[in-house]
């Protein structure tokens, strides 16, 4: 027995595939790096992430270098990785890069037992974080925006 697929969903899937192909033709202006399962509390890491968001890469490195926090060392490694990805994978120049996105998500928690008095025990949660840094090229944003507008016109004319 052959599975019947509704025509509307078939049309939509073809449209999305075509749109995805067209979007891949856009110029690459951003690179990303993710560090997962890092043994630091997300709350502590977010404090550092908030300080570098929106800053140029050079300024972000300076902020992280002078921060005494453990999260700053980790964030510095992730930022270095994102910059290397931008440089090597997409050929973006380091001088024009800025931190467009920087966020910290909760990872899994390790539960540990902490013995207390009178035979009781408390559970301590050792938290982990997933840290994501996205760097973007300021000089190519206008070019990207124009290409995106042209692409949207092309897609809307095909519908």
From Swiss-Prot:
This is Large ribosomal subunit protein uL22. Keywords: Ribonucleoprotein, Ribosomal protein, RNA-binding, rRNA-binding. One of its GO terms (molecular function) is rRNA binding. One of its GO terms (biological process) is translation. One of its GO terms (cellular component) is cytosolic large ribosomal subunit. This protein binds specifically to 23S rRNA; its binding is stimulated by other ribosomal proteins, e.g. L4, L17, and L20. It is important during the early stages of 50S assembly. It makes multiple contacts with different domains of the 23S rRNA in the assembled 50S subunit and ribosome. Part of the 50S ribosomal subunit. Belongs to the universal ribosomal protein uL22 family. Pfam families: Ribosomal_L22. NCBIfam families: rplV_bact. It comes from the Bacteria.
């Amino acid at each position: 027995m052959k599975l019947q697929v509704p025509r509307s969903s078939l049309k939509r899937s073809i449209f999305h595939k075509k749109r995805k192909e067209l979007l891949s033709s856009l110029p690459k202006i951003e690179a990303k790096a993710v560090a997962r399962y890092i043994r630091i509390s997300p709350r502590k890491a977010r404090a550092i992430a908030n300080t570098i968001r929106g800053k140029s890469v050079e300024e972000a490195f300076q902020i992280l270098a002078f921060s005494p926090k453990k999260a700053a060392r980790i964030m510095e490694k992730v930022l270095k990785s994102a910059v290397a990805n931008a440089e090597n994978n997409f050929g973006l120049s380091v001088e024009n890069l800025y931190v467009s996105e920087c966020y910290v998500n909760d990872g899994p928690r390790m539960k540990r037992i902490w013995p207390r008095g009178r035979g009781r025990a408390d559970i301590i949660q050792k938290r982990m974080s997933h840290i994501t840094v996205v760097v973007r090229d300021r000089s190519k944003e206008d070019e990207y925006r124009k290409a995106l507008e042209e692409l949207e016109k092309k897609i809307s004319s095909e519908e």
